[in-house]
Amino acid sequence: MAVENNTQRSYSIIPCFIFVELVIMAGTVLLAYYFECTDTFQVHIQGFFCQDGDLMKPYPGTEEESFISPLVLYCVLAATPTAIIFIGEISMYFIKSTRESLIAEEKMILTGDCCYLSPLLRRIVRFIGVFAFGLFATDIFVNAGQVVTGHLTPYFLTVCQPNYTSTDCRAHHQFINNGNICTGDLEVIEKARRSFPSKHAALSIYSALYATMYITSTIKTKSSRLAKPVLCLGDLCTAFLTGLNRVSEYRNHCSDVIAGFILGTAVALFLGMCVVHNFKGTQGSASKPKPEDPRGVPLMAFPRIESPLETLSAQNHSASMTEVT
């Protein structure tokens, strides 16, 4: 009987997942692919001063030569929250004290007449799926900002190698709008025009903050008071150091890293609070009692005082009834 009370029939959850959510996810991944791997979106050509000291830092090499390479970054920021959510959900499901509250918040879904979707499977797919969507969405926002602004990296003039003997560069305070003045490698120059906001900073803080919100909202540890702070602060510190590494290697300006942190934080907070509702179950809000309508409540209640006339009338009525009987 308890299983029947905790079961909800739904014929739309699987079609909605296949034809709506998977389509949106595929479109997001496809758009991120076009930003990353194709020349569909051309970078804005931003002008510069030939003697700008902020753009004359030494060339740090390719991204693969960085202390935090893109491959290592993407693997860590994708695997860490996924592993935390997977291990956390399985642990809570098999621990008796947390399993009861989990079942109370999340109902078993019956699709058709034979297929059951357990609360464990639904929560894992929901939380990891939203995280993956936010990861690609953050990447799209970053690439869009870099393409639109065309902000120059600190080493731009080093790889641009402008012709300083030309008429345009002879004047120290002349602003150069001509992109053809550069004589360096065109591929490296194009990458040097994509600095704002910092992709490493945005993705790292998004991943760290999403994992931190999950840990603080779902994992309950009464025996240890320092386990959760260590995990959360460790993730946030790693993201912070990733941004500092971009500045120390002259790959981004401080403003680029700060903008990346703000962007990643905004996406993580929006998804964590407004989409997955602080990682609570779908039945969590339904169990709260509805507030009483204030229109039906009197502004002030006074005690009722019985009138002497009413008392005398009641006594006479009872006496008359006695005489009749």
Curated annotation (Swiss-Prot):
Keywords: Cell membrane, Cell projection, Glycoprotein, Membrane, Phosphoprotein, Transmembrane, Transmembrane helix. It is a multi-pass membrane protein. One of its GO terms (cellular component) is plasma membrane. Induction: Shows a transient down-regulation due to overexcitation of neurons induced by kainic acid. Glycans are attached at residues 5, 163, 316. It holds the Pfam family PAP2. The keyword Lyase does not apply. Its main location: membrane. Highly expressed in the brain. Also found in the liver, kidney and testis. In the brain shows a strongest expression in the hippocampus and cerebellum. InterPro entries: P_Acid_Pase_2/haloperoxi_sf, P_Acid_Pase_2/haloperoxidase, PA_PP_rel. Gene3D superfamilies: Phosphatidic acid phosphatase type 2/haloperoxidase. GO terms for biological process: nervous system development; phospholipid metabolic process; signal transduction. One of its GO terms (molecular function) is phosphatidate phosphatase activity. The modification Phosphoserine is found at residue 307. Coiled coil: none annotated. May play a role in neurite outgrowth and neurogenesis. This is Phospholipid phosphatase-related protein type 1. The lineage of its organism: Eukaryota, Metazoa, Chordata, Craniata, Vertebrata.
